[in-house]
């Protein structure tokens, strides 16, 4: 159980530093409500908030007494780690030692870059803990990645793919050291009670996917059924989530990668169509609140689409890019590039990353073993959890993304593989005058984050007119 207490000025100040404008917690009556200064209510402050030694303890934290050790610890196979991953393990062990000394909960956020190897590093930690653990995922796309990792360390496990009711029935017949679940399982209170009693470690993968200032299943679980040990895994942590896990370990990835961002600039003549004219009318309305119509119009930009195709075809034929992922915002845009590129290169080279395809995991598995391919998907599918370490190139066809989404997308090509060169290609110009400045603004945001935060080097290619020969001339690459 969380720490039930009145929120005095000092505690309120510490919580507000993290929460920002609005602070929401469960009160003693079970209501999820905003916390105001001098409230007469007592509130449940998550024990993970006190994982930081800088936060004074209101009262000793009570833990469940039972220990849930794994049954066959002698059979565990420790995974091989890179030196920078071993450094994370050392930092975690040092943090645990301090927490034990000060009687603080072992709640740690592993803030590690995309491509760092958070999954295998976490498996190493599980091997050291030798405690039963629950691995909680935001969606099923990540299941296979975790299943392979757990199998590699030889831990007994259950993967839940058929819902929490079926899992509860299976757990009556069989116990497992590791449960791999999706977060919606935590809506079931019977299941929450069961894992609270029978499992000691909880890993929340892709923790940035959850806003714990909302009354969600994960928020409620961490408040009412807090595990003994908890890890949040993310490349892009949400600040507000520190209220539930208030100690962060951040270690940089020292992989020797040569990373380039290629900016293909073109000065198009103005283009429009009846479809575009109709959508332009909605640009300054609530319909475009999340820039959906900006992206819809961009998808209809024929000259820009042709430039993107020319760039991809030229660079792929010249073997400047080899294992490529193309990302769009809209499914329609994705299908456009898939149809054109599959016609050009064939279905043995071009693959569709369609979340609606039940066999998508088989497609992802297949391209891992292919030397050269083009994989086309949406930002929604490929942003988090796409596990293709061999990717070396990324073409971004969309424009509007927040910083978290940008870093997740760029992270798809920052993993360790045989190739040491990584290339991102962006297109900051559009032939549609009504969205010209907006597209330029958001593309510059991508460029700035790639260079300043992820250490990409800039390559600029410029042109004046949309002419094929000129287009190809400016697509020459110098690395």
From Swiss-Prot:
SUPFAM superfamilies: P-loop containing nucleoside triphosphate hydrolases. GO terms for cellular component: transcription preinitiation complex; virion component. One of its GO terms (biological process) is transcription initiation at RNA polymerase II promoter. Its EC number is 3.6.4.-. It is found in: Virion. Residues 308-469 form the Helicase C-terminal domain. GO terms for molecular function: 3'-5' DNA helicase activity; ATP binding; DNA binding; hydrolase activity. A motif (DESH box) lies at residues 205-208. InterPro entries: ATP-dep_DNA_Helicase, Helicase/UvrB_N, Helicase_ATP-bd, Helicase_C-like, P-loop_NTPase. It comes from the Viruses. Belongs to the helicase family. Poxviruses subfamily. Interacts with G2. Might be part of a transcription complex composed at least of G2, A18, and H5. This is Transcript termination protein A18.
